[in-house]
């Protein structure tokens, strides 16, 4: 087979968009506690902003409770402040060198707004996947124009790129559907 584009590289980039989407939706709060909920939280520590998981250990002792064990006692108030200011709607309770974070029930309005955020993440990922497809198609057109591959080979590879794109976007839609169900579950 003639050289046109690196299909494996396109697949790797599309899979990267799916991984980023999985990471994004994992941080969305559902009815159950998950340490990923606190992924977006950053703390003012040692002169810079660092992710919470670099200054504390996060555990899930109960379905509606998170526990954050801060490694450095002097950081407890900074961790509490970071969680309160994170716009996650969480109110940590300081308990010595750790914080307990009860997760309130999600009301219908909050659930719908979380679903909307999940849809935004999905759309962002689909756009990234389409950019990868466009890069691949542009590469094929250039290779065909430069005489590196023939028209038939270009068409065959272009169909493979489109099929790969469709499958990857279907995967995003499937993951979105699962997350939506999880969020709306009461």
Swiss-Prot record:
Pfam families: RRF. It is found in: Cytoplasm. Residues 144-163 are annotated as: Disordered. The keyword Ion transport does not apply. GO terms for cellular component: cytosol. GO terms for molecular function: ribosomal large subunit binding. Keywords: Cytoplasm, Protein biosynthesis. Its main location: cytoplasm. GO terms for biological process: cytoplasmic translational termination. InterPro entries: Ribosome_recyc_fac, Ribosome_recyc_fac_dom, RRF_sf. HAMAP family: RRF. Responsible for the release of ribosomes from messenger RNA at the termination of protein biosynthesis. May increase the efficiency of translation by recycling ribosomes from one round of translation to another. Belongs to the RRF family. This is Ribosome-recycling factor.
């Amino acid at each position: 087979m003639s050289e046109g584009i690196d299909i494996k590289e396109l697949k790797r980039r599309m899979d990267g968009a799916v991984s980023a989407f999985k990471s994004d939706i994992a941080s969305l709060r559902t009815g159950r506690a998950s340490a990923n909920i606190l992924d977006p939280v950053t703390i003012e520590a040692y002169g810079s902003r660092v992710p919470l998981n670099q200054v504390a250990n996060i555990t899930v002792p109960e379905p509606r409770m998170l526990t954050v064990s801060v490694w450095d006692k002097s950081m407890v108030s900074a961790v509490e402040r970071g969680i309160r200011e994170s716009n996650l709607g969480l109110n940590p309770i300081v308990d010595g060198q750790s914080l307990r974070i009860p997760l309130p029930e999600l009301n219908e309005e909050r659930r719908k707004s979380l679903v909307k955020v999940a849809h935004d993440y999905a759309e962002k990922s689909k756009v990234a996947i389409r950019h990868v497809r466009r890069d691949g198609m542009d590469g094929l057109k250039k290779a065909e124009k430069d005489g590196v591959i023939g028209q038939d080979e270009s068409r065959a590879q272009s169909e493979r790129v489109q099929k790969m794109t469709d499958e990857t976007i279907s995967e995003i839609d499937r993951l979105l559907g699962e997350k939506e169900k999880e969020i709306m579950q009461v």
